[in-house]
């Protein structure tokens, strides 16, 4: 290799090739817009959908994982789908194709907007005063907000597709587009509103 072909010392190996990488070899992950500054730090978007558990066991490092992979992992957290990573990945890939076909928008942007809209700002905790449990409203940490949003989206997908003629990728596409549009009929947004309603009553 000549000196002209050698990479710069500060440049990561393969940086030029990585710049043009796309999620599922289709979707560009650059130029994503965030409407909620509190969760922007915890919604990571990368073209890598499977990191082989690189951050497993490291506290709070889940925020370094792509939000797409975190959604895939969430979809596996039912008895029927435990460990079926390829199946969950295929569901997300097909859902993204369906979202792009229906909305003509970037499905990655739709996912980010859905997570932001489904993330609850308040919830309740139980405090004991003299042996009596009293609900108390508390603010939700940004990282937990993202966790809860992914949980609601996965639960809504499972409930809409389990023992139903609706395919899982169709149910997921409906959940994401509904949440991105802040449709209160969507399971994820409905659960967020319910949590905040209960918290408001416990102030």
From Swiss-Prot:
CDD domains hit by this protein: uS7_Eukaryote
Record-linked PROSITE patterns: RIBOSOMAL_S7 (PS00052)
Region annotation (Disordered) ranges: 1-22
Pfam family, any one: Ribosomal_S7
Keyword Ribonucleoprotein: yes
Superkingdom of origin: Archaea
InterPro entries: Ribosomal_uS7, Ribosomal_uS7_arc, Ribosomal_uS7_CS, Ribosomal_uS7_dom, Ribosomal_uS7_dom_sf, Ribosomal_uS7_euk/arc
Record-level GO cellular component terms: small ribosomal subunit
Alphabetically ordered keywords of this record: Ribonucleoprotein, Ribosomal protein, RNA-binding, rRNA-binding
GO annotation terms (biological process): translation
MF (Gene Ontology): rRNA binding; structural constituent of ribosome
Keyword Ribonucleoprotein: yes
Family to which the UniProt record says this protein belongs: Belongs to the universal ribosomal protein uS7 family.
Protein task: One of the primary rRNA binding proteins, it binds directly to 16S rRNA where it nucleates assembly of the head domain of the 30S subunit. Is located at the subunit interface close to the decoding center.
Assembly and interaction partners: Part of the 30S ribosomal subunit.
Entry protein name: Small ribosomal subunit protein uS7
The species this protein was found in: Halococcus morrhuae (Micrococcus morrhuae)
């Amino acid at each position: 290799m000549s000196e002209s072909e050698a990479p710069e010392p500060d440049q990561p190996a393969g940086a030029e090739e990585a710049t043009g990488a796309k999620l599922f070899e289709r979707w560009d992950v650059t130029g994503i817009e965030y409407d909620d500054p509190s969760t922007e730090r915890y919604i990571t978007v990368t073209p890598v959908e499977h990191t082989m558990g690189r951050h497993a066991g490291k506290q709070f490092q889940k925020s370094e994982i792509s939000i797409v992979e975190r959604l895939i992992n969430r979809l596996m957290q039912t008895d029927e789908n435990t460990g079926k990573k390829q199946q969950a990945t295929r569901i997300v890939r097909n859902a993204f194709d369906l979202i792009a076909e229906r909305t003509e928008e970037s499905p990655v942007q739709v996912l980010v907007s859905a997570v932001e809209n489904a993330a609850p700002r308040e919830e309740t905790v139980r405090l004991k005063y003299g042996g009596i449990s009293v609900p108390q409203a508390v603010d939700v940490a940004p990282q937990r907000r993202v966790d809860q949003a992914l949980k609601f989206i996965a639960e809504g997908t499972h409930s809409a597709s389990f023992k139903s003629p609706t395919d899982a990728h169709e149910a997921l596409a409906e959940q994401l587009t509904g949440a991105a549009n802040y449709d209160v009929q969507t399971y994820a947004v409905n659960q967020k509103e319910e949590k905040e309603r209960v918290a408001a009553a416990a102030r």
